[in-house]
Amino acid sequence: MNSNDLAKRGESLIRHSTNRYLTTVRIAFRAKQRRFDDFDGLLEESTVKPVQRAIIELSDEQDQPDLLPG
């Protein structure tokens, strides 16, 4: 994942949101969850930082809502 692609995904999340603040909070909350998952050993070692992983996950959820459970 290069920085340009990550920036585009982040911009897309903000652009498609109705509330930029809540989107930023969602990214931060997801990153915090991923960070604790890393500490708990639930995720394999990765070079992708938690904030980057959160942006990727939320962007994928936005672009492909059929991936969401339920």
From Swiss-Prot:
Its EC number(s): 2.7.7.6
Top-level taxon: Bacteria
UniProt xrefs under InterPro entries: DNA-dir_RNA_pol_omega, Pol_omega/Rpo6/RPB6
Pfam families named among the record's database cross-references: RNA_pol_Rpb6
Single GO molecular function: DNA binding
Cellular component terms (Gene Ontology): DNA-directed RNA polymerase complex
GO-annotated biological processes: DNA-templated transcription
Record keywords, A-Z: DNA-directed RNA polymerase, Nucleotidyltransferase, Transcription, Transferase
The reaction(s) this protein catalyses: RNA(n) + a ribonucleoside 5'-triphosphate = RNA(n+1) + diphosphate
Stated role: Promotes RNA polymerase assembly. Latches the N- and C-terminal regions of the beta' subunit thereby facilitating its interaction with the beta and alpha subunits.
Similarity remark: Belongs to the RNA polymerase subunit omega family.
HAMAP family found in the cross-reference section: RNApol_bact_RpoZ
Summary of subunit composition and partner proteins: In cyanobacteria the RNAP catalytic core is composed of 2 alpha, 1 beta, 1 beta', 1 gamma and 1 omega subunit. When a sigma factor is associated with the core the holoenzyme is formed, which can initiate transcription.
Protein's name according to its UniProt entry: DNA-directed RNA polymerase subunit omega
